[in-house]
Amino acid sequence: MAELACFCYPHLENDSYKFIPFNSLAIKCMLTAKVDKKDQDKFYNSIIYGIAPPPQFKKRYNTNDNSRGMNYETPMFNKVAVLICEALNSIKVTQSDVASVLSRVVSVRHLENLVLRRENHQDVLFHSKELLLKSVLIAIGHSKEIETTATAEGGEIVFQNAAFTMWRLTYLEHKLMPILDQNFIEYKITVNEDKPVSESHVKELIAELRWQYNKFAVITHGKGHYRVVKYSSVANHADRVYATFKSNNKNGNMLEFNLLDQRIIWQNWYAFTSSMKQGNTLDVCKRLLFQKMKRESNPFKGLSTDRKMDEVSQVGI
């Protein structure tokens, strides 16, 4: 995750702003600079290489002292920054909005995946600039539309029916912020269209999840899509979701947190996110993740719980 101010800076033109991507040498200069405390939140002028991000975001970049940040010296950083600028320059951002826009926390990996989709000649985003920009505006939280299959970050499709598409995420192969844990495995489920889904299509998805992904929890980050994650990583997801929710509220980015379909979401996660929306503390909310929940009655008649062992997936064991 990183703020949009880590990728670009605003330049006032007439009554709105044009956004310009940072170059890696300007960032490198900022990372070595001594800056007064009172100037930590201001864009840094490297003199030689142009404007750099505010020093308060130093931890967002990979350095000798911080290996968890972005690999900003890779070509992928520039591609992501340029893509963000293209999207922001396609809309009008006024002086009253610019600070709020640049403070938005976005998924770096999501944006890298959109770059990969853009570069794939077989992908619809390669052929449609309009759909590409729409996908980016959704990814950076500017659009109120949800991420559907056409505008999704992408990955490897492992399941699809008339209503849903399930993707295996390819973060292990990323350049900007790769997942380093080689045991990482995670999926995302997007709706093919933002409209009501028939019960039969929900039933098909639940059956697929129950038999092929029985070692995973279905959760949501509140953005209109589902994530299918290992139970061992649920607490980590909870920390991130809670932090992003609080940050967005603090900065005035009051995007609606979408709880999604309770029949699909893991019961404990639904309880966690509901509690978070009510304004409870992280500790209070997280307790619900480890609490034994009363088992819901089967919402679908005919969805059997009987299955032969050789038909049950061992993925995630």
UniProtKB/Swiss-Prot annotation:
Cellular compartment(s): Host cytoplasm
A single cellular component GO annotation: host cell cytoplasm
Main location: host cell
Ranges where the record places region RNA-binding: 205-241
Assembly description: Homooctamer. Interacts with VP1; this interaction is weak. Interacts with NSP5; this interaction leads to up-regulation of NSP5 phosphorylation and formation of viral factories. Interacts with host DCP1A, DCP1B, DDX6, EDC4 and EIF2S1/eIF2-alpha; these interactions are probably part of the sequestration of some host SGs and PBs proteins in viral factories.
HAMAP family associated with the record: ROTA_NSP2
Protein name, per record: Non-structural protein 2
Protein source organism: Rotavirus A (isolate RVA/Human/United Kingdom/A64/1987/G10P11[14])
